[in-house]
Amino acid sequence: MVLILNGPNLNLLGRREPEVYGRTTLEELEALCEAWGAELGLGVVFRQTNYEGQLIEWVQQAHQEGFLAIVLNPGALTHYSYALLDAIRAQPLPVVEVHLTNLHAREEFRRHSVTAPACRGIVSGFGPLSYKLALVYLAETLEVGGEGF
């Protein structure tokens, strides 16, 4: 089972700056992730919050709840949440950071991820497919013992 976590403002997908983030809503993204997970033999649980503390608690509790991995879109917390970085580092599960947009093609302040150093990798810039690519990676690595590349 993979926990898919989405941070602040992702509840506005499809309505907030669709020229930047696309027209896929959060509900549609959840359905896509469930379908992709099923294709890959992975169960997924999909959550979203606008609160940094809630996101941190979910990361901290994921292992105890029986999840095998986390797919994380921290939203703007990517760029400044050292508390989230510490939470990722403090738990044993593999985490893949995802972003709908290409961080390096955005404004200067969005080009740096403070959370990335604690993650196995980042998938950025492929819209909803960023989530699928993260799930493909996790399906492959969990299948071979979780070591990854």
From Swiss-Prot:
Name of the protein in its database record: 3-dehydroquinate dehydratase
Pfam families assigned to the protein according to its UniProt record, in alphabetical order: DHquinase_II
Record GO terms (molecular function): 3-dehydroquinate dehydratase activity
GO biological process: amino acid biosynthetic process; aromatic amino acid family biosynthetic process; chorismate biosynthetic process; quinate catabolic process
Family: Belongs to the type-II 3-dehydroquinase family.
Record-listed E.C. numbers: 4.2.1.10
Active site per the UniProt annotation: Y21 (proton acceptor), H99 (proton donor)
Keyword Lyase part of the UniProt annotation: yes
Subunit text: Homododecamer.
Source domain of life: Bacteria
Residues reported in the UniProt entry to bind substrate: N73, H79, D86, L100, T101, R110
InterPro entries named among the record's database cross-references: DHquinase_II (IPR001874), DHquinase_II_CS (IPR018509), DHquinase_II_sf (IPR036441)
Gene that encodes it: aroQ
Pathway noted in the entry: Metabolic intermediate biosynthesis; chorismate biosynthesis; chorismate from D-erythrose 4-phosphate and phosphoenolpyruvate: step 3/7
Site (Transition state stabilizer): R16
Keywords assigned: Amino-acid biosynthesis, Aromatic amino acid biosynthesis, Lyase
Reactions catalysed: 3-dehydroquinate = 3-dehydroshikimate + H2O
Role summary: Catalyzes a trans-dehydration via an enolate intermediate.
